[in-house]
Amino acid sequence: MSIFLDQIEKRKLLEEASLAETFEKGTRRMGIGSSKRHAVPPSDHGAMRSVLDALGVTGYELTDSEMTTPEEQLNAILRPKGILTRKVSLKDNWWKQSIGPMLGYDREGNLTALLPTRWGFGYTFTDKDGETRPVNRKAMASSLSRHAITFCKPLPHKTLSQGDLLKFAFKSMSMTNLALLLATALVLALFGMFTPMANKMIFDIVIPTGEARDLLPIFGLLAGAGIGTMLFSLTRNLCTERIRRVVEMHLQNAVMARTFFLSPKFFTKNSSGELTARLDNVSKICSLLNDTIVGAFLTLLFSVVYVAQIFTYAQSVTLPSLAIIAVEIIALVLYYRSIVRARSEYTEKYNKLSGMEYGMFAGIQKLKLTGSERRALTLWLDKYTQATHRIYNPTLDRRLIPALLQLCNVGGTAVIFYFILANGVTTSDYIAFSSAYGMITAAITTIIAVIPEMAQIKPMLDSLNPILEETPEMEQNAPMVDELFGSIEMTEVSFRYSDDSPLVLDNISLSIAPGEYVGIVGKSGCGKSTLMRLLLGFEQPLKGSIYYDNYDLSKVDKTSLRRKIGCCLQNGSLFTGDLFHNITITAPWSTHDDAWEALRMADMEKDVRRMPMGLHTVVVEGSSGFSGGQKQRLLIARALIGHPQIIFFDEATSALDNISQKQVSDNLDSLNCTRIVIAHRLSTIRHCDRIIVLDKGHIAEEGNFDQLMEKKGLFYEMSLRQM
């Protein structure tokens, strides 16, 4: 009965807190409260609507609440849709780049929508008088701020195929740029038709008459075609580069965002080095498409216009010519498939090799300490040889097909000569036909040259399959967690890591009140860290439910929940960078004063102030410049920077001396937040309000330190080992 009474009491506390919060909001809206925020101006709403409409967001509602800023409202609307925001500085002539809709600021700090023009060349904004104006140097100098918010469109939050990825890339293109690219490619193909025409005119008109002056108009025609070809080639290259940059930006951001939203379980199956190699392929794919393949394929595609010329000049040779071209295309397909097989094997093994290389360099000190450099190098050489075997030792078909293509060209020319002689084609028609046919064979030769690059794309896309096939952790339209009071409840939770493994946690029920200090202890393998992973949503329980206040963990937006929790897990690490960004990474809005306060709470302030660069002290790979205790205190500071209502510590003070540990514990006592601590040292949990003893996946004992010692049970036996 006590469990149900505790739950009823907890519900009453939550209802009272909710009523107090609602009353506070009401008084602030009437001007009685102390909030310094103001209602959102109508112009800000207009700017936000314009940007949201441009992003294709529907089903949202903007309010005039004084409790939220426009940026907070925007984040609340976009977060369930998976659209990420980022603050940027607008430098130089930024409006000449197509980077999608943005939310900017005017000189008075009000929001304004920065929208691309209809044709994708330039931006417009709405001034304070409601007039739409183009963005230019004058507008930037007089009306607009140099700061804005950009948006990253996400990939769909479901299992994706390579086709879905390519479809997303296609949608990110500007249709204006795409139409311009196709138009310039067509014009270039049409310019190429002038050469066969000029050859025919020379042999039909100039040579028979012997009039040299007749060459002048033909020369002018060819010169104009040459200049036009040069200019349109430049336009095509610029357009291709523009498309590549836009597609690469959207695709790279979307794939990276999807990777970060994958469940923690995904990262246990893929090493950091391997994931880096896979993600790098996104940029490589865009570069390969832009640098070689798009141009070559557009040339081949529009070479169809030369078929019409072939038919016009030598109708009797058209069918044999098309047959030869068809044979060459079939050989190209076979050549492509043979290279793809070799590249697929190489790419997959290379990704694994990258993961191994990263691990070797990360553990280079251990390799040197144990004198294992030669063994590591031998292992690397063995894996490298396996990965590159098919690249340096191509199969027979890969060596034969290029030679057969050359033979096909020579043999095809002989066949064409035979049909020309047999059908009595005139000299002028033959010369014109030869020029047109040469354009087609030149396009095929270009394709042959880029096939090795083209064959890399399919294996690179295959390497992204683990990321595409994994479903992101984010649930569409899941409720956001705006505030926590600190209540946690687990009801009959069971969990196992695989279907054929035993239960790690078996029917665990646990209720933690707001502000309670709870310690969790037990022998190694009893399920302490697993319990923490379940509470953080890193794993899904086999059965049972977990609630934070009134939020069901299985249905809530887990990222917004974790932002309200300060967490310091076992074997945590610092990032490469400086101390300030390491501490504030979980709360990027924090100031230097906030960072110093977090360091003080973690008993690390004095140490950092003694460092010459203070908060700007550089953290190198592996955090080799810091002791184990300093590293743990920095991680504790990171957990405290956001002023969380719930704190999780998993062996977070194991490297601290007793004095530092007591100082940290005393500082945490002043926060009046819910604390859950996993520890082995009795000094860490001695002052807990409640200690939970786990054994073989069950709660074996429960009570405060003195009560458990009096029971002389499992906790008492564990404590004797430390006395």
Mark where each language-model region is:
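Membrane-integrated ABC transporters
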Residues: 1-195, 208, 212-217, 236, ...
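A hydrophobic transmembrane-helix motif
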Residues: 195-201, 293-336, 392-439
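Cytosolic ends of transmembrane helices, especially the final helix of ABC transmembrane type-1 domains
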Residues: 349, 353, 365-372, 396, ...
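Loop segments that connect adjacent transmembrane helices in multi-pass transporters
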Residues: 253, 257-274, 345-393, 479
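Primarily ABC-family ATPase nucleotide-binding module
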Residues: 468-519, 552, 593, 597, ...
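Transmembrane-helix motif of ABC transporter permease domains
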Residues: 175-195, 201-249, 257, 268, ...
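Helix-to-loop junction immediately C-terminal to a conserved catalytic motif
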Residues: 536
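ABC-family ATPase nucleotide-binding domain "signature/switch" substructure
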Residues: 530-533, 563-571, 579-582, 589, ...
